[in-house]
């Protein structure tokens, strides 16, 4: 009976040594392989329909550009929302076309 208990204890010690980190008890944070998080984000944003540019910074940009043409312009909130919707749709289409061009040329990275 005593002979059977000793190996179990040795196995338990061996398993404990394997799971314990080698650098004195400080565990490294978990990291995904390169590209995994990017693919997950691509799937997430392709499923979603909400606007991705923050509303207030976009509104400030619209007002700044419009002030170059005419001062003291006022905007309905629905007009700014329509401009933002169109701008984001245009940018998504542009990135889709850019990605197709990069794939065609045998590249992965797109650059401005």
Curated annotation (Swiss-Prot):
Concerning Pfam families, the annotation shows:
Histone
Q: Which GO terms describe its molecular function?
A: DNA binding; protein heterodimerization activity; structural constituent of chromatin
- According to the record, the residues making up region (Disordered) are 1-31
Q: Name one GO cellular component term.
A: nucleus
Q: Which UniProt keywords apply?
A: Chromosome, DNA-binding, Nucleosome core, Nucleus
Q: Which top-rank group of organisms is this from?
A: Eukaryota
Location comes to: Nucleus; Chromosome
Q: Which residues form a coiled coil?
A: none
Recorded hits in Gene3D superfamilies, A to Z, give: Histone, subunit A
Q: What is its main location?
A: nucleus
Q: Where are the transmembrane segments?
A: none
Where in the sequence is the signal peptide annotated?
none
Q: Which InterPro entries match?
A: Histone-fold, Histone_H2A/H2B/H3, Histone_H3/CENP-A
What PANTHER family does the entry give? HISTONE H3
User: Into which family does the record put it?
Assistant: Belongs to the histone H3 family.
Primary role: Core component of nucleosome. Nucleosomes wrap and compact DNA into chromatin, limiting DNA accessibility to the cellular machineries which require DNA as a template. Histones thereby play a central role in transcription regulation, DNA repair, DNA replication and chromosomal stability. DNA accessibility is regulated via a complex set of post-translational modifications of histones, also called histone code, and nucleosome remodeling.
Record text on subunit structure and interactions: The nucleosome is a histone octamer containing two molecules each of H2A, H2B, H3 and H4 assembled in one H3-H4 heterotetramer and two H2A-H2B heterodimers. The octamer wraps approximately 147 bp of DNA.
* Name used for this protein in its record: Histone H3-4
- Organism (species): Stylonychia lemnae (Ciliate)
What lineage is this protein's organism placed in? Answer: Eukaryota, Sar, Alveolata, Ciliophora, Intramacronucleata
State which gene encodes it: H3-4
């Amino acid at each position: 009976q005593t002979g059977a208990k000793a190996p179990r204890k040795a196995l338990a010690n061996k398993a404990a040594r394997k799971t314990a980190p080698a650098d004195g008890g400080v565990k490294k944070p978990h990291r995904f392989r390169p590209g995994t998080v990017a693919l997950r984000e691509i799937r997430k944003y392709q499923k979603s329909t909400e606007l991705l540019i923050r509303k207030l910074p976009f509104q400030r940009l619209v007002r700044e550009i419009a002030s170059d043409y005419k001062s003291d312009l006022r905007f309905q909130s629905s007009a700014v929302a329509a401009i933002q919707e169109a701008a984001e749709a245009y940018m998504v289409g542009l990135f889709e076309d850019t990605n197709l061009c990069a794939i065609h040329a045998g590249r992965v990275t797109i650059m401005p």
